[in-house]
Amino acid sequence: MSSSCIEDLSIQDNQWYRIAHEMLGLAGIEINGSRPFDIQVKNPEFFKRVLQQGSLGLGESYMDGWWECERLDMFFQRVVSAGLEKKLPHHLKDTLRIAAARLTNLQSKKRAWIVGKEHYDLGNDLFTLMLDPYMQYSCGYWKDATTLEEAQEAKLRMICEKLQLQPGMRLLDIGCGWGGLSAYAAKNYGVSVVGVTISAEQQKLAQARCAGLDVQILLQDYRDLHQQFDRIVSVGMFEHVRPKNYRTYFDVVERNLAPHGLFLLHTIGSNKTDMNVDPWINKYIFPNGCLPSVRHIAEASEGHFVMEDWHNIGADYDRTLMAWFERFKQAWPQLAERYSERFERMFSYYLNACAGAFRARDLQLWQVVFSPKGVEGGIRVAR
């Protein structure tokens, strides 16, 4: 046992340690245990920090090297399954932030660009090394896939089939990322695509990827769109919209969709209707984001669309995230010159924490197909 472990520091009588020991025991996790999901604590202040600051304290203390865990994904699966995050006291700053989110619009047109600059503009080198050739930063579809490349291409194919794309159609890709879906649809289905993103780095790479194809990549807020499209798709973008803007979002989609068109929404979802913001994720990964619930989507779309199909592939996100993590680890020697060790710990924590939450089925991934007035005879969607 390392001399930095808590047994050697003789603080087991500390009240913070006792509380943490009891709580972790509910998830079957031991402090300085020998199993992959047990934690190794390096700083005795860890317990107080986490119990006082909750999720933010847990994540920041890991970034600071206060604790280690061989399999963070397994640790978080157990923590989430046991509901431990609900037992932690709310940090005052978290409470105030949630209250502010209910009162203010954190995804106004001005604020919407923050996530583009703080996350998606981290650098194309990072995402190029971590993602598949289509650079899909969203859940793959692993039904018949054995590799990340196969899973992401299967996802793209399924989306295009659900939208029933035909040559000559116009497709709007809201939150087009690095242009993978836009390029795939244009090349394989003969459609004309307009993609929008709020990330300058994404636009740059997407334009290069789509060179020679009937694809236009715009750097703008989706709310400024005033065109007509046969089909609209939005993958991994609705998580950034927030409840105050959900109705506006569906207003924009309705305004830009042809009367007999189809719209596919691909989004991470929460099991409960709340502000659904993790303080650590909000600070370090996706500022001003919020996960929608079934109720959020149903209420926001009511009066705009008929819901034709709802498909949950959330279990596949666990495997996608772990594939990203393996690639991130392999690529780290190439990335280390540009990014700090603290960044490496932050990004590893993010990928594994999310994988554990999906594995515990606390998070979902939904693909929802809408039509303006209902498709006569209904539609049979791809699976």
What are the functions of these language-model segments?
Residues M1-E153, M158:
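Feature captures hydrophobic
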Residues G168-G175:
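Conserved class I S-adenosyl-L-methionine
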Residues W178-Y189:
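Conserved SAM-binding loop of SAM-dependent methyltransferases across substrates and taxa
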Residues A211-Y222:
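Conserved SAM-binding strand-loop segment of SAM-dependent methyltransferases
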Residues R223-I232:
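A short acidic, Gly/Pro-enriched loop at the edge of an enzyme's catalytic core
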Residues R247-P259:
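A short glycine-rich, Lys/Arg-flanked "PGG" loop and its adjoining helix->strand segment in the class I
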Residues H260-I268:
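Conserved beta-strand signature within the Rossmann-like core of class I S-adenosyl-L-methionine
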Residues I268-G378, R383:
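Substrate-binding/catalytic lobe of Class I Rossmann-like enzymes that use SAM or dcSAM, i.e.
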